């Protein structure tokens, strides 16, 4: 009798019913591959970042005279503070690795045809990028200060209102204490907005159902999410945590910038100002345009162009796996993305400038030529 009551408990309680339908009894295509693991890995990354961020915020001081010292204090005097800081910093890198794999899978298998899910995903990408940029400023090292100065100053390229908006962002006529205070405020707030928008993202996904590698209706071959896919996701969690902890314990500052170990000094400019490695592709696109406003437009377009995919890609088959001509274009685009990341970390001189301009053209060309190639292929078929 008690067993029957326990079994029916998720059906009786409204909250448990929602959780049960989303995480236990959710019908999932049986043939989804490991590429579908990255959504759950992103959820894990977000949870790790929020929890560790809360503990770091307890010890951080958002004041230009004390910010750098407070980060040093966290690493030296707070119990396991060094581990919290390095896992938080490297966790951001793993977050973006999972994001880029997640987006790449969506592009390859045609998940962008789920319009609402894709658009909320792009909004999530912008929010996560904003949070990561703001977090990069908080240690108040040399690269933090000059990165904040250079990137926010790009807003001044907007006609008429640009300079006023920059001063509003800075809270004055230069990057100073008001800037750091508001950056910390928004860095603390945005992850909770990301968590809320993630719920909406999942709501749209569960309305349409998940895509699958074949891109066909899988209603006849679906399994409950638990236990098969919970075990698959748990394996992914273990692998991610293993690599994150290993990196944080063996080479914690490998993905950081050495200049950030120097306190911020407005009078000394670093030899090469650059953002975090996961923004370097966009930074290379920005640098490849000689005009300031044109560079800003190209920078924003490098992400915003993902919005065009549901409108320009109208194939007979959902994914690229059935288009042998389009597959080389996709993997060439992935190579261009990686090369742009490398170019973004190089000095602003030839041949890197010239290579960056060629790669920028190649980056945007994918979104123009691939739909044309697919349409021609469909007509031949």
Swiss-Prot record:
Keyword list, A-Z: Electron transport, Heme, Iron, Membrane, Metal-binding, Mitochondrion, Mitochondrion inner membrane, Respiratory chain, Transmembrane, Transmembrane helix, Transport, Ubiquinone
Cofactor annotation remark: Binds 2 heme b groups non-covalently.
UniProt cross-references to Pfam families, sorted A to Z: Cytochrom_B_C, Cytochrome_B
SUPFAM superfamilies given in the database record: a domain/subunit of cytochrome bc1 complex (Ubiquinol-cytochrome c reductase), Transmembrane di-heme cytochromes
Membrane topology term: Multi-pass membrane protein
Positions that bind a ubiquinone: 206
GO molecular function: metal ion binding; ubiquinol-cytochrome-c reductase activity
CDD domains: cytochrome_b_C, Cytochrome_b_N
Subcellular location as annotated: Mitochondrion inner membrane
Gene Ontology process terms (BP): mitochondrial electron transport, ubiquinol to cytochrome c
Keyword Iron applies: yes
Coiled coil regions, renumbered to chain: none
Cellular component terms per the entry's GO annotation: mitochondrial inner membrane; respiratory chain complex III
Binding site for heme b b562: 88, 187
Known cofactor(s): heme b
InterPro entries: Cyt_b/b6_C, Cyt_b/b6_C_sf, Cyt_b/b6_N, Cytb/b6-like_sf, Cytochrome_b, Cytochrome_b_C_euk/bac, Cytochrome_b_N_euk/bac, Di-haem_cyt_TM
Chief location: mitochondrion
Sequence positions that bind heme b b566: 102, 201
Stated role: Component of the ubiquinol-cytochrome c reductase complex (complex III or cytochrome b-c1 complex) that is part of the mitochondrial respiratory chain. The b-c1 complex mediates electron transfer from ubiquinol to cytochrome c. Contributes to the generation of a proton gradient across the mitochondrial membrane that is then used for ATP synthesis.
Record-stated family: Belongs to the cytochrome b family.
Subunit and partners: The main subunits of complex b-c1 are: cytochrome b, cytochrome c1 and the Rieske protein.
Family matches, as PANTHER family: CYTOCHROME B
Full protein name: Cytochrome b
Organism: Artemia franciscana
Gene (name only): MT-CYB
């Amino acid at each position: 009798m008690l067993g029957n009551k326990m079994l029916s408990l998720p059906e009786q309680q409204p909250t448990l019913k929602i959780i049960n339908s989303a995480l236990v009894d959710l019908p999932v295509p049986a043939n989804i591959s490991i590429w579908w693991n990255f959504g759950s890995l992103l959820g894990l990354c977000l949870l790790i970042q929020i929890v560790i961020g809360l503990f770091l915020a307890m010890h951080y001081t958002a004041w230009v005279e004390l910010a750098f010292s407070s980060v040093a204090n966290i690493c030296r005097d707070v119990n396991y503070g060094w581990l919290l800081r390095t896992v938080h910093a490297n966790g951001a890198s793993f977050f973006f690795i999972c994001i880029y794999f997640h987006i790449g899978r969506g592009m390859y298998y045609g998940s962008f045809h789920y319009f609402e899910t894709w658009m909320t995903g792009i909004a999530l990408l912008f929010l996560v990028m904003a949070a990561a940029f703001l977090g990069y400023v908080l240690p108040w090292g040399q690269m933090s200060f000059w990165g904040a100065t250079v990137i926010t100053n790009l807003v001044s390229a907007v006609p008429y209102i640009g300079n006023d908006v920059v001063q509003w962002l800075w809270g004055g006529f230069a990057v100073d204490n008001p800037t750091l205070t508001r950056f910390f405020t928004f860095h603390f707030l945005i992850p909770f907005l990301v968590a809320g928008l993630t719920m909406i993202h999942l709501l749209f996904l569960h309305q349409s159902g998940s895509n699958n590698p074949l891109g066909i209706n899988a209603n006849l071959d679906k399994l409950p999410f638990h236990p098969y896919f919970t075990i698959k996701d748990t394996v992914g969690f273990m692998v991610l945590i293993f690599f994150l902890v290993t990196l944080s314990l063996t080479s914690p500052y490998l993905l950081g910038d050495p200049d950030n170990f120097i306190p911020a000094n407005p009078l000394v400019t670093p030899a090469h100002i650059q953002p975090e490695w996961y923004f370097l592709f966009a930074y290379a696109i920005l640098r490849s345009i000689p005009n300031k406003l044109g560079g800003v437009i190209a920078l924003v377009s490098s992400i915003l162009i993902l919005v065009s995919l549901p409108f320009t890609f109208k194939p007979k088959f959902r994914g690229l796996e059935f288009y042998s001509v389009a597959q080389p274009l996709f993997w060439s685009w992935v190579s261009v993305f990686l090369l742009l990341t490398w170019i973004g970390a190089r000095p602003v001189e030839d041949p890197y400038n010239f290579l960056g301009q060629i790669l920028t053209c190649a980056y945007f060309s994918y979104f123009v030529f691939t739909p044309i190639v697919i349409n021609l292929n469909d007509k031949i078929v």
